[in-house]
């Protein structure tokens, strides 16, 4: 039986996934702007591309359909309605200011789709706009700015496709991102899901979010979201995802009978543990890898459908987070593999995404090669670790889990 579109678990057989290869946006990273763009360092882009293609090849070797975001966006831009939808939003007054649309829209609209997709993800500097297009408002802006400043900012964090949208069972969220450097990513991902033929012909729900709305204090990122199965969704609440957004997702899921409970992992906000999946991820049906110093401090909040005005009840569960997750799945407990090494090595490996692995099927995960101690412990626990190189890809603080947006994943029987 064919699995319907959606992420029905965290470890079932992965069927279909979206990734985004490092390209022009990463060539725009410099020592002076990388922190603002949420990277810790600049990348050797050619090497990052080589390693990312190796990652993709290893997934395809196992029969996984891998979609690349630049390619999907290019195919959306081949469609007149899709191209207009994207340009309307990328050139809106809130995105570029009044008057700019009139100066640059025709130039962008005349581009081949693959070139336009590259610029929409990679950014457009003022100096790249042809001289004959620098009229009116844009001409004044170029004199006020350096030619190397960006009219359309680059989006290097598209590399981490997990975050901008998240599939939860048979639907998807369009996520309002926490930091300005990432907020425009959701526009492009939304365009793909609403206009690309491979999605237009399939039946799925939109649980939450709108690329055009001002969500205020409601922020949500996919690295915090785990549809683990048995009607249970885990969501981290730390640096990136807020109670305001989490509760709206819960209400939507419960109102449509799509979930039976949500376990919110309340975490201290910290860059090293920006998302739940940086400290906790599933490797097998009953096995997780975790960073104990953070996971031990999680306060689990359990949300369940109710007749209350909000549409749900909430209670604090005093048990350890892993015990709450296990009982939600109908298990007596979870096997755990902690970040490897002594206290110093464990900190290093967590920072280098040792716990941020993505399951290709039960008991098979992709992880970074540099996390030797954690990978050895996973292997000892019976997990096959498919290693990919970390030296360049990891500079944005994201591993295999972050770099994949599962679109179709099999359920697991709990």
From Swiss-Prot:
Principal place of residence: cytoplasm
EC number: 3.5.3.6
Keyword Hydrolase: yes
Enzyme's top EC category: hydrolase
Matching Pfam families: ADI
Active-site feature positions: 402 (amidino-cysteine intermediate)
GO molecular function terms attached to this record: arginine deiminase activity
Gene Ontology annotations of biological process type: arginine catabolic process to ornithine; arginine deiminase pathway
Source taxon at top rank: Bacteria
Alphabetized UniProt keyword annotations: Arginine metabolism, Cytoplasm, Hydrolase
Pathway where it operates: Amino-acid degradation; L-arginine degradation via ADI pathway; carbamoyl phosphate from L-arginine: step 1/2
One GO location term (cellular component): cytoplasm
Catalysed transformations (reactions): L-arginine + H2O = L-citrulline + NH4(+)
Localization of this protein: Cytoplasm
Family: Belongs to the arginine deiminase family.
Protein name: Arginine deiminase
Species whose genome carries this gene: Cutibacterium acnes (strain DSM 16379 / KPA171202)
Gene field: arcA
């Amino acid at each position: 039986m064919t699995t319907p579109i959606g992420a029905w678990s965290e470890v079932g057989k992965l069927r279909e996934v979206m990734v985004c290869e490092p390209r022009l946006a990463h060539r725009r990273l410099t020592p002076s702007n990388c922190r603002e763009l949420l990277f810790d360092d600049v990348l050797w882009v050619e090497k990052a591309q080589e390693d990312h293609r190796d990652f993709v090849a290893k997934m395809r070797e196992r029969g996984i359909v891998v979609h690349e975001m630049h390619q999907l966006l290019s195919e959306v831009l081949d469609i007149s309605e899709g191209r207009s939808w994207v340009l309307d939003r990328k050139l809106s007054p809130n995105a570029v200011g009044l008057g700019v649309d009139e100066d640059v829209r025709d130039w962008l609209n005349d581009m081949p789709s693959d070139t336009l997709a590259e610029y929409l993800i990679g950014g457009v500097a003022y100096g790249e706009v042809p001289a004959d297009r620098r009229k009116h408002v844009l001409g004044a802006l170029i004199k006020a700015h350096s030619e190397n400043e960006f009219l359309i900012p680059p989006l290097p964090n598209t590399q981490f496709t997990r975050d901008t949208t998240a599939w939860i069972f048979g639907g998807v969220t369009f996520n309002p991102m926490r930091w300005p450097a990432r907020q425009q990513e959701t526009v492009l991902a939304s365009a793909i899901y609403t206009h690309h033929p491979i999605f237009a012909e399939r039946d799925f729900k939109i649980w939450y979010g709108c690329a055009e709305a001002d969500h205020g204090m409601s922020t949500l990122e996919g690295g915090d979201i785990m549809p683990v199965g048995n009607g249970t969704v885990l969501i981290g609440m730390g640096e990136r995802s807020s109670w305001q957004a989490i509760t709206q997702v819960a209400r939507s899921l419960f109102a449509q009978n799509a979930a039976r409970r949500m376990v919110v992992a309340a975490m201290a906000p910290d860059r090293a543990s920006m998302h739940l999946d940086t400290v906790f991820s599933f490797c097998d049906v009953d096995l997780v890898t975790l960073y104990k110093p953070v996971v031990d401090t999680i306060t689990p909040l359990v949300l369940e459908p109710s007749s209350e005005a909000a549409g749900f009840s909430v209670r604090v569960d005093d048990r350890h987070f892993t015990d709450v997750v296990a009982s939600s799945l109908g298990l007596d407990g979870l096997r755990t593999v902690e970040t490897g090494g002594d206290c110093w090595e464990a900190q290093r490996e967590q920072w280098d995404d040792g716990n941020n692995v993505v399951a290709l099927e039960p008991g098979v995960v992709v992880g970074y090669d540099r996390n030797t101690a954690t990978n050895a412990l996973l292997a000892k626990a019976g997990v096959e670790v498919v290693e990919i190189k970390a030296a360049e890809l990891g500079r944005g603080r994201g591993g295999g889990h972050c770099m994949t947006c599962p679109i179709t994943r099999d359920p697991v029987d709990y």
